[in-house]
UniProtKB/Swiss-Prot annotation:
EC number(s) from the headed UniProt entry: 4.1.1.65
Protein's pathway: Phospholipid metabolism; phosphatidylethanolamine biosynthesis; phosphatidylethanolamine from CDP-diacylglycerol: step 2/2
Organism, as annotated: Burkholderia vietnamiensis (strain G4 / LMG 22486) (Burkholderia cepacia (strain R1808))
Site (Cleavage (non-hydrolytic)): G181, S182
Name assigned to this protein: Phosphatidylserine decarboxylase proenzyme
Needed cofactors: pyruvate
Keyword terms: Cell membrane, Decarboxylase, Lipid biosynthesis, Lipid metabolism, Lyase, Membrane, Phospholipid biosynthesis, Phospholipid metabolism, Pyruvate, Zymogen
Top-level taxon of origin: Bacteria
Encoding gene per record: psd
Taxonomic lineage: Bacteria, Pseudomonadati, Pseudomonadota, Betaproteobacteria, Burkholderiales
UniProt modified residues of type Pyruvic acid (Ser): S182
PTM entry text: Is synthesized initially as an inactive proenzyme. Formation of the active enzyme involves a self-maturation process in which the active site pyruvoyl group is generated from an internal serine residue via an autocatalytic post-translational modification. Two non-identical subunits are generated from the proenzyme in this reaction, and the pyruvate is formed at the N-terminus of the alpha chain, which is derived from the carboxyl end of the proenzyme.
Assembly with partners or alone: Heterodimer of a large membrane-associated beta subunit and a small pyruvoyl-containing alpha subunit.
Signal peptide coordinates: none
Membrane topology category: Peripheral membrane protein
Length: 214
């Protein structure tokens, strides 16, 4: 499947344009000696908003990682968005990770719900319940419920979600973006088998988080 998005996220285009204009102006006025920090800033901004295509595993019961980052939680927890006990797997994204979110499974969206909140460090547990967040609840064709929650962080204060209830999602499909690092919680049915461990580095779409019970 071709990735239907530019490798530099559209969300970053205005920032890249501003950084490029500033670097060009400083270079024109003072030469490279004055402008090199701004060229370096431009390189950082471009790198920050990269959004590369990733291979998608073919395994039908696989739950794919929704974001790049590091695993900070694998535990049984209450899923308040689907009102159930669930296996919760949390991915923390730092400022150097890719910041787009991609669907963990194929399915139909049953609910999208936004919650205002605080902006605590997204790596800590209480960020899941106290920070600003946006939950997407997905029903698979086999009747399984998978909840993916975008969570704002200490620096990240803008959650973007591009899907609505009733729409279909394909695994690996890009559905959201959070600027400047944050967290994504995934809630899965009890009986799902986690395939990652705390501290592990993971990649959106290409890392298998868990396997749904068949």
């Amino acid at each position: 499947m071709n990735y239907p998005h530019p490798i530099i996220a559209r969300e970053g285009w205005p920032f890249i344009a501003i950084a490029a204009v500033i670097a060009l102006l400083i270079h024109a006025i003072g030469g490279f000696g004055f402008a090199w920090p701004f060229w370096l800033l431009l390189v950082f901004v471009v790198q920050f908003f990269r959004d590369p295509q990733r291979p998608i595993p073919a395994q039908p019961n696989a739950v794919l990682c929704p974001a790049d980052g590091r695993i900070v939680a694998v535990e049984t927890s209450h899923d308040p968005y689907a009102n159930r006990e669930a296996l919760k797997i949390s991915v923390f994204m730092n400022v150097f990770n890719v910041h787009s979110q991609r669907s963990p499974v194929d399915g139909a969206i049953s609910k999208v719900e936004y919650f205002p909140g605080a902006f605590l460090n997204a790596a800590i547990d209480k960020a899941s319940t106290e920070n600003e967040r946006n939950a997407v609840v997905i029903q698979t064709a086999s009747g399984k419920t998978v909840t993916a929650v975008q969570i704002a962080g200490l620096i990240a204060r803008r959650i973007l979600c591009y899907v609505r209830a009733g729409e279909p999602l394909s695994r690996g499909q890009r559905y959201g973006f959070i600027r400047f690092g944050s967290r994504v919680d995934v809630y899965l049915p009890l009986g799902s088998r986690a395939k990652v461990s705390i501290g592990e580095k993971v990649y959106a779409s290409s890392t298998i988080l868990a396997e749904l019970e068949q």
